[in-house]
């Protein structure tokens, strides 16, 4: 008997970088939001071996895939001889700022904990998730949350309204490490106001949510890839209420009042050289 799980992507409604730590990581404060766009993992038990196959968007099934890393970490920590055959249907663009790899790792931890009957608590899984990447703990929890530390310290918020989202992922990827290297903490632009964004979400005020969108990494990635500014402008022109880059990029998203509006507006968007999708907050 196998298990089938959805692994939802995320966007950042705010992203602030507070400090650089001695270990090279950065202290952040950000509001993260799960979105309807998701990968699908199908997991079946087999003896000892862990194998991975992938369909959909092309990604490596080699050892550096976070699905395999998560499975092997759980296998090692649990001391189990059980294995798993994992199939990943990849729908979330890679190197996009949408946590595509992180959410697959989180779903793997969740799925194998159930399949192998390990009985690990959510907190135990969260500690393992932190070892796999800064976005993995949020992806494990999902929903709407403030993330602090390197992203592992989560404060769950009330679920956000199901605002519509248009996602535009250019053909190029972006290295998160390079973006952070290009960040100058003394020269940050608009800083997010976390409290104001939380209030806007609670009041379901799309206009105010749009005004509070802020990501201090955006200016760095825009310098590297000026085309992103053009994409932002097009999203504004077709009627998106607010526009921002997610994570370290390069995906840019536009907000609308609901999923139907996102689907309607997307028809007016030129798609040349970009991966364009309509989604909503979940």
UniProtKB/Swiss-Prot annotation:
Pathway assignment: Isoprenoid biosynthesis; isopentenyl diphosphate biosynthesis via DXP pathway; isopentenyl diphosphate from 1-deoxy-D-xylulose 5-phosphate: step 3/6
Keyword Mitochondrion found: no
Broad class of enzyme this protein falls into: transferase
Function: Catalyzes the phosphorylation of the position 2 hydroxy group of 4-diphosphocytidyl-2C-methyl-D-erythritol.
Regions annotated as coiled coil: none
Organism ancestry: Bacteria, Bacillati, Bacillota, Clostridia, Eubacteriales
Alphabetical GO biological process terms: isopentenyl diphosphate biosynthetic process, methylerythritol 4-phosphate pathway; terpenoid biosynthetic process
Presence of the UniProt keyword Transport in the record: no
Entries under InterPro entries matching the protein: GHMP_kinase_C_dom, GHMP_kinase_C_sf, GHMP_kinase_N_dom, IspE, Ribosomal_Su5_D2-typ_SF, Ribsml_uS5_D2-typ_fold_subgr
Binding site for ATP: 93-103
Reaction catalysis annotation: 4-CDP-2-C-methyl-D-erythritol + ATP = 4-CDP-2-C-methyl-D-erythritol 2-phosphate + ADP + H(+)
Keywords, comma-separated and alphabetical: ATP-binding, Isoprene biosynthesis, Kinase, Nucleotide-binding, Transferase
Family recorded in the similarity comment: Belongs to the GHMP kinase family. IspE subfamily.
Catalytic residue list: 10, 135
Protein name from the UniProt record: 4-diphosphocytidyl-2-C-methyl-D-erythritol kinase
GO molecular function, one term: 4-(cytidine 5'-diphospho)-2-C-methyl-D-erythritol kinase activity
Enzyme Commission number: 2.7.1.148
């Amino acid at each position: 008997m196998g298990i089938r799980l959805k692994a939802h992507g995320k966007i950042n409604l705010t992203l602030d970088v507070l400090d650089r730590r001695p270990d090279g990581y950065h202290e952040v404060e950000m509001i993260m939001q799960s979105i309807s766009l998701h990968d699908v993992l199908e997991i079946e038990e087999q003896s000892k071996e862990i194998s991975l196959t992938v369909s959909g968007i092309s990604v490596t099934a080699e050892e550096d895939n976070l699905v395999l890393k998560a499975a092997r970490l759980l296998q090692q920590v649990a001391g189990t001889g059980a294995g798993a055959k994992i199939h990943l249907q990849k729908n979330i663009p890679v190197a996009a700022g949408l946590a595509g790899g992180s959410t697959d790792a989180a779903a793997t931890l969740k799925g194998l904990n159930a399949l192998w009957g390990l009985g690990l608590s959510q907190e135990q899984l969260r500690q393992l998730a932190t070892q796999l990447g800064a976005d993995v703990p949020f992806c494990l929890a999902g929903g709407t949350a403030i993330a602090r530390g390197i992203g592992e310290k989560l404060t769950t918020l009330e679920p956000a309204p199901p605002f519509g989202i248009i996602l535009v992922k250019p053909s190029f990827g972006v290295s998160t490490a390079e973006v952070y290297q290009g960040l100058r903490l003394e020269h940050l632009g608009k800083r997010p106001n976390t409290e104001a964004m939380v209030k806007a979400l609670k009041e379901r005020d799309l206009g105010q949510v749009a005004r509070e969108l802020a990501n201090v990494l955006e200016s760095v990635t825009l310098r590297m890839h000026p085309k992103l500014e053009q994409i932002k402008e097009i999203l504004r022109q077709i009627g998106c209420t607010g526009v921002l880059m997610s994570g370290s990029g390069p995906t840019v998203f536009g907000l609308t009042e609901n999923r139907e509006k996102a689907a309607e507006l997307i028809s007016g968007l030129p798609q040349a050289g970009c991966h364009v999708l309509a989604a909503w907050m979940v």
